[in-house]
Amino acid sequence: MTILMKENLKKNNPRKPIRSPLFYVGDKYKLMPQLLEVFPNNINNYYDVFGGGGSASINVEAKHFHLNDIDKKVIELHHFLQEKSANIENFIFEMQLLINYYGLSHSEFGKNPVIEELKKVHKKTYFSKYNKSGYLELRSDYNSNQKRTDLLYLFITSIWF
C-alpha cells in the first residue's frame, strides 16, 4: 500500500469542477476542490470504486480510469454518454427529438404558453402537471425495452414528481 504524504504532493491547478451529466446521491461535485488539493499530479490509473454519477472521475486528470458501481445500469449510462460524447451535437439533437416525441417540457426554446398558464394555477407543481403523461409514457416504453439506454438517460434526467 502506498501512503501519500501531503508534502510530496503538488497542488493541481485550481479550476471550477465539471458537473456530471448524471445527478447521483453522494455526488462529489462540491467536494472536488478540496479533494483535488490532495491528489497527486501524474496519476496513471485512477480507480473510482464508488463511481455513481462520476463527478470524481470527470474532474481528475489521469492516463487511465477505472469506474465501478454496484448498479450495472449506472455503468451502462456512463458507457452510453462516453460513446455519445464523440458527436455531442447529434446526441443533443437525438435527445430533443425524444423530448418532443414524449411531449416533455424543454426550456431551451423559451417560455411555453401552456406551462405559463399551468404556473398560474399550480404554483409549485406546474412542471409535473405538464410532464406527467409524457413521463409515464417514457417510463412505460423504457420498462418494455430496457435496452434503450437513451430512454433511461432521458427518464432519469426528467422531472421527478
For each predicted feature, which ranges?
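S-adenosyl-L-methionine
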Residues: 1-50, 55-56, 60
